[in-house]
Amino acid sequence: MEVILIKPVRKLGKIGEIHKVADGFGRNYLLPQKLAIRATELNKELIVKQKHELEEKDKQIKSEITKINDLIKDQKLIFVRQTSDDGKLFGSVNNKEIAKKLSQAVSYPISHLNIILDTQIKSTGIYKVEVRLHAELSTEVTVIVARSESEIQDYLREQKTEKSTTEPLAESA
């Protein structure tokens, strides 16, 4: 199936590009999500006329997302959970929980689909999690999973000492 992208799609292309995709991918994902339209002759002509308008709209969205990314990148999300003696969680921390806590922290609705998490977090520690609000823009948040408030403070102190030891020392002349 040939489609014309009307929004940028990660790992596929930019606005206005024509791509040949699998029928299922086109029918079940690209078309229902309004990321693309079928590449008919009429649609090709329409997209040529509307491409500039679509790109301008995408630039506006990107600038808004950039502002939100600036808010997100400094966030530390803290989860206190029950664990076994070896630090394994009873349960896990998943992308839905991260999205909910991040939405509350920045006062902006963030879908769990925007949280890129390969596997659920199943043990205590500090994790970097990718947040992708736009196909071309992403940022990272710090997720801290601990069994108590005191353990969180230990992680934060540990992180500060790591930063101070990795920063280059000013040379005295």
Swiss-Prot record:
GO BP annotations listed = translation
> GO MF terms on file?
rRNA binding; structural constituent of ribosome
Lineage: superkingdom: Bacteria
Keyword Ribonucleoprotein appears in the UniProt entry: yes
According to its UniProt entry, what is the function of this protein?
Answer: Binds to the 23S rRNA.
Q: Which PANTHER family match?
A: 50S RIBOSOMAL PROTEIN L9 (PTHR21368)
**Could you tell me what this protein is called?**
Large ribosomal subunit protein bL9
Q: Which gene encodes it?
A: rplI
